[in-house]
A protein has these predicted regions:
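N-terminal pre-catalytic "stem/leader" segment of glycosyltransferase-like enzymes
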Residues: 3-131
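Conserved catalytic-core segment of nucleotide-activated headgroup transferases in glycan assembly
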Residues: 80-88, 96, 206-291
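Extended catalytic core of nucleotide-activated donor transferases of GT-like folds
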Residues: 50-55, 67-69, 100-188
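Short hydrophobic "strand-cap" motifs at the C-terminus of beta-strands
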Residues: 69-70, 156, 181, 200, ...
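Donor nucleotide-sugar binding/catalytic pocket of nucleotide-sugar-dependent glycosyltransferases
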Residues: 176-187, 194-209
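Residue-level recognition of beta-strand->loop/alpha-helix junctions
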Residues: 100-102, 201, 263-265
Length: 291
């Protein structure tokens, strides 16, 4: 551990400095090169995680409760996922607090639903870490080893592909068990670890705003509509909207006026290539809608 901790501290300092200097760096160095350097730091940190000795769980060392760690304010699917988990805790008998961890600049972060639960400390004996394995080394550097020690550490992960990147395997070392929202993800992760992997689906409530009806989105009122939505930042290959379009085409012909498929892309302005790729697949289907 003594050999690993200095690297973690230096890596965290380097990343923080890089983010502080981002406005200057992006003018001098190509974004692709900056991303590559950051990826190297994360990769080195991930490898060193396997050498880090986490003090085993001591139930009585801290108060009973849950420290929920992740980007609770993020206006993304991952942020909403964390808020759904927080909503479950809010309606349970468990004491909990939120540590708002994110990788700067963090994108749009305007959600204030759980601002009242955010603290800079994690006083409870369970860490529920809503951070995907690709960023877990950064979270470990940011939160610190002390927050991991003597606590029961649970990762809540989302990864919808069957193959799990080998460079992420060291992330398992930091956890006692893993939770996922679907059995598909759980089955895939169990192939890579002997640690417990549980499926805990979301508890979803969906309050509707009457202003945002089908007329608002220029969608037909008299059709059964399927919805496929994703964030361009999550990658087209991973979210697979083209697969949804192909499945719809196989199930229904272009003249079918009883059904429709709605494709909704978040942050579409950041991926014109994705939009063009999707439009080429619409192929004259008037019952496929893009919003």
């Amino acid at each position: 551990y003594r050999k690993v901790e200095p690297f973690m501290s230096l890596s965290k300092a380097a990343l923080n400095m890089a983010e502080a200097l981002r406005p200057v760096l992006v003018k001098l160095i190509p974004q692709k090169m900056l991303s590559a350097v950051k990826a190297k730091v994360i990769e080195k940190g991930a490898k060193d995680l396997e050498k880090t000795e986490i003090t085993p769980f001591e139930p009585q060392a801290h108060k009973k409760g849950i420290n929920l760690i992740g980007s609770i304010k993020s206006d993304t699917g991952l942020g909403q996922s964390m808020r759904l988990v927080a909503e479950i805790l809010e309606n349970s008998t468990w004491d909990y607090t939120v540590y708002d961890y994110f990788v700067p600049p963090g994108g749009s972060r305007t959600n204030e639903a759980f601002d009242g639960k955010i603290t800079q400390t994690g006083p409870y004996n369970i860490n529920l870490i809503h951070v995907n394995p690709s960023e877990l080394p950064l979270a470990f550097m940011d939160v610190g080893k002390k927050q991991w020690d003597t606590r029961y550490n649970i990762g809540y992960w989302l990864w919808e592909l069957e193959e799990f990147p080998k460079e992420w395997l060291p992330a398992f070392h930091l956890l006692d068990e893993v939770w996922t929202p679907s059995e598909f993800i759980s089955q895939n992760l169990r192939k890579y670890t002997d640690k417990l992997v549980y499926t805990l689906p979301y508890s979803v409530t969906a309050p509707a705003d009457a202003a945002y009806d089908r007329d608002y989105f220029h969608l037909p009122k008299d059709r059964f509509l399927f919805l496929m939505m994703y964030d361009s930042g999550s990658g087209m290959v991973r979210k697979n909207p083209l697969g949804a379009i192909e499945a719809f085409k196989q199930a229904f012909d272009r003249e079918n006026k009883q059904v429709g498929l709605v494709i909704k892309m978040n942050r579409s302005e950041q991926s014109e290539k994705d939009i063009e790729n999707i439009r080429t697949k619409l192929d004259g289907y008037d019952n496929i809608y893009f919003i």
